[in-house]
Amino acid sequence: MQERLATRGLDVDVRELPASTRTAADAAAACGCEVGQIVKSLVFLVDGAPAMVLCAGDRRVERIDGRPAPADEAREATGFAIGGIPPLGHDRELPTIVDESLRRFERVWCAAGTPNAVFDVRVEELLAALPHAEVRAV
């Protein structure tokens, strides 16, 4: 995962945590941050095709015209299981929508491929690594 992130211009340290980060609350407790600083990487089916939605951990997705992808389709689209899906570095590029509320933080924490792996990154660096992402209310 570290190499995949580096190819997107992110110089971050992937950390393995002893506790699961499967939920935003678990991740926030393990990382010592606010729940809102956790980036939920969610796969939605929009017009039948997978799309990545990056949502703040303290928010719900309410403005996406689509539905959450089943676990098997999320894994097929990203190469990762739900609970460990990173915001980028997937097996294939996906259209990405980023929750604009993430900008209220300087740094956020993201899953890094497994339920126990995370990395922290400046929000603006994450957005720079996703140049084609649409940033808006989700």
Where in the sequence are the language-model features?
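Extended, low-hydrophobicity, polar/charged segments
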Residues: M1-V138
